[in-house]
Curated annotation (Swiss-Prot):
Interacts with CtaB. Disulfide bonds join 35-42, 189-195. Its EC number is 1.17.99.9. This is Heme A synthase. It comes from Bacillus cytotoxicus (strain DSM 22905 / CIP 110041 / 391-98 / NVH 391-98). Catalyzes the conversion of heme O to heme A by two successive hydroxylations of the methyl group at C8. The first hydroxylation forms heme I, the second hydroxylation results in an unstable dihydroxymethyl group, which spontaneously dehydrates, resulting in the formyl group of heme A.
Length: 313
């Protein structure tokens, strides 16, 4: 059964990644109304008779989301049953399921009541939490903790501050990026790092949205670089923290490069999908560090309690 659950965790993670990338594809190709304003039917039909490319893309995204719902539900039930001894299993299972349902409802609302940019940005953010929760469940199922000896990890307050802070801030940056996409502001500023050679500063809404995202992303990059330097200096012996920040740095660097290429490739589909892929992976890595941070607090209390017992015995 454990082998089956491991395979299920991998397939579910890939399916949810497909949901995220599929959503980006729907937005990029303007296929949000590919099935009209009907949901869960497509143009009022179970199997649409007229299959345009927009209809195929939107319908594929719905089918992927539907299969993800089934897989996540099954994974949550099995992990709850067979891995309930692990402290984080139950909350992660609840998060995975609740946020998957929430993103499905948000997607349905976007179809029925119109493509509001702010709502679509929230839709992507909610999907990201569900994806990260499933990735963390998969890490628990594959016992990544044992491989990195992370169960007894203790971090200082400074490192935990950077982990929590970067993760929360990265989530806000994700919203600014999603807003750029849904406001169709990807090419509002044709130059980098400033808006344009003739007008370095934004003058209208779409330019402000684009430049706001750039500033937020640059700050995120700088924060991750600083946190990585701290990890290299003080946590080289704790491989999971050390490698976690190095991985985050690699992903945020790739994210930045692809973001710049989005501008210079006229927002090509490949660059847009890679942009969504790298930020999804980065957020999952940061969430794993958050889980380690919460565990560190418990480990510190247990260590203090053990030392007190030894002192008074």
């Amino acid at each position: 059964m454990q082998r089956f659950i491991k395979w299920l965790a991998v397939i579910t993670s890939l399916d949810l990644l497909g949901v995220l990338l599929g959503g980006a594809l729907v937005t990029k190709t303007d296929s949000g109304q590919g099935c009209g304003k009907s949901w869960p039917l497509c143009n009022g039909e179970l199997v649409p008779s007229n299959l345009s490319m927009e209809t195929i893309i939107e319908l594929s995204h719905r089918l992927t989301s539907g299969s993800a719902g089934i897989l996540v539900t099954l994974l949550c039930i099995l992990s709850w049953k067979y891995y309930k001894h692990v402290r984080e299993t139950k909350p992660l299972a609840i998060l995975s399921f609740v946020f998957l349902v929430a993103q499905a409802l948000m997607g349905a609302a976007a179809v029925v009541w119109g493509q509001v940019p702010a709502v679509l940005a929230i839709h992507f953010g909610i999907s990201l939490i569900s994806f990260a929760s499933v990735i963390l469940l998969a890490c628990l199922i594959f016992e990544i903790d044992k491989k990195f000896d992370a169960r007894s990890l203790i971090m200082d307050k400074k490192m935990k501050f950077h982990i929590y802070g970067v993760t929360i801030y990265s989530y806000l940056v994700v919203y600014t990026g999603a807003l750029v996409r849904h406001e169709r502001a990807s090419l509002a500023c044709p130059e980098f790092p400033l808006c344009s050679k003739n007008r370095p500063w934004p003058t209208q809404l779409h330019e402000w949205v684009q430049m706001g995202h750039r500033v937020a992303a640059i700050l995120l990059f700088a924060w991750i670089v600083y946190a990585m330097i701290l990890a290299i200096r003080h946590y080289k012996q704790e491989r999971v923290v050390y490698l976690g920040w190095i991985t985050s740095f690699i992903l945020v660097t790739l994210q930045a490069i692809v973001g710049i290429l989005v501008v210079y490739t006229n927002a090509s589909l490949t660059m847009a999908l890679l942009h969504s892929l790298f930020i999804s992976c980065l957020f999952a890595v940061l969430c794993y560090l958050v889980m380690l941070g919460t565990r560190s607090k418990v480990n510190a209390k247990q260590t203090t309690s053990t030392e007190n017992k030894r002192f008074f015995s």
